[in-house]
């Protein structure tokens, strides 16, 4: 692991992840498993995710990789349960890079670009999930070409 963490922290540039925003198969499985509690749990994701993003941003400002690790780990787990692949992957890179920085007594400066884009990625992901979870959106069906939605 030490050789891997060294690569992560010092030798490999951190780049934004280009993956699918939502894995709808995972999201559907979570929705099925949670049933009517899905919307409530998604609300917790909004609250906890916002808190995690704020903690990651504060840790970046303080150049504190230790504080960054737990918040990124929490965000990563919550994102994965909803199939939020891009957010999960970004949180994973932040967590693993911050862990490597802790081991090497280094600052997480190379994470700046990812951390700066994290809040907008979280908000975009959440908006897509909430729109999909909205009963109004799910119940709208097109009536045909050129007709209004029913």
Where are these regions (language model features)?
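Two-component system phosphorelay core
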Residues: 1-70, 74-150
